[in-house]
Amino acid sequence: MPADIPKSVVQKLVFFTAAMIICPVATFFICQYLFSNNAIISGGVSALVANIVLIGYVVAAFMEDTTEQEPEETKKSR
């Protein structure tokens, strides 16, 4: 029996998964170029960017509306 997972949840997960992979790697190589091959600075900034993406995901998950609409009461269910 498949679970009823909203499409917006899957889209958000895919977006943040891609961001978690692409942003730190891109940041590392951009910092390598800008700071003349200093791996310590590049790695630190890359770790900072990974943490920012992770915090963004947590905030987005908490702000998501997950309340389900309760079925209306009928005379039989009372």
Curated annotation (Swiss-Prot):
InterPro entries: Vma21
Lumenal side: 36-38
Key word Membrane present: yes
Keyword Membrane on entry: yes
Residues that span the membrane, as ranges: 15-35, 39-59
Motif Prevents secretion from ER: positions: 75-78
Keywords annotated in UniProt: Cytoplasmic vesicle, Endoplasmic reticulum, Membrane, Transmembrane, Transmembrane helix
Record Pfam families: VMA21
Subcellular location, record wording: Endoplasmic reticulum membrane; Endoplasmic reticulum-Golgi intermediate compartment membrane; Cytoplasmic vesicle, COPII-coated vesicle membrane
Residue numbers on the Cytoplasmic membrane side: 1-14, 60-78
Gene Ontology BP term (one): vacuolar proton-transporting V-type ATPase complex assembly
GO cellular component: endoplasmic reticulum membrane; endoplasmic reticulum-Golgi intermediate compartment membrane; ER to Golgi transport vesicle membrane
Membrane topology: Multi-pass membrane protein
Record family assignment: Belongs to the VMA21 family.
Function statement: Required for the assembly of the V0 complex of the vacuolar ATPase (V-ATPase) in the endoplasmic reticulum.
Name used for this protein in its record: Vacuolar ATPase assembly integral membrane protein VMA21
Gene source species: Debaryomyces hansenii (strain ATCC 36239 / CBS 767 / BCRC 21394 / JCM 1990 / NBRC 0083 / IGC 2968) (Yeast)
